[in-house]
C-alpha cells in the first residue's frame, strides 16, 4: 500500500506541530515552564498591588512589572502560535512545502531543496490533530501531513498503517 501527502509548512501547520510537541514529548518541560511563567506573573501582580496598598506613586518599575506580566500572559496563551512563527522563520529555503510517499519499508519526503528517505523506527511519537497527522522524531523535530491531501487510501487506513509500521499508538491532540 502507498499513501501520499502534499503538505505546506505554513502558520497553521507549524502551530499543529508545536502543539503536538508541547503535549507529548515536551510535556514535562512545558508544564515546568508554564508554572514558572505564571509565578512571574503572580509576582509582578503582587509587587504592583503592594506598592498600591502603600500609596506609593506609580513609577517606571510598576510600568515594567505590568509590561512583563502582560507579555508573559500573552505568550503563555499563544505559545504554540509563537513557536510556529519562529519555526517558520527558521525554515530553509525550498522547504515550505513537501510531498511525502509512505511505502511498506520507509517513506520519502521531497521538497524543492532535497528528497529524504526516513525509516519508521526513527519515529518517537505519532500524533493526530483535526487537520494533520504528525510524526515526531525528537523534542525539536517533527513532520506534519495534511489529511486533506491524503491519496492512496483513507485516513482510517493510514492510521492503521502508521500504527503498524511505527509500533506506536496515535496520540490525539485537540
Sequence positions of predicted segments:
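Phosphoinositide-dependent membrane-docking surfaces
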Residues: 107-108, 116-131
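Short beta-strand segments
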Residues: 3, 116-118, 143
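Short, surface-exposed charged micro-motifs
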Residues: 97-99, 124-125, 134
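Hydrophobic alpha-helical transmembrane segments
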Residues: 56-71
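N-terminal membrane-targeting/pre-transmembrane regions
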Residues: 1-44, 48-52
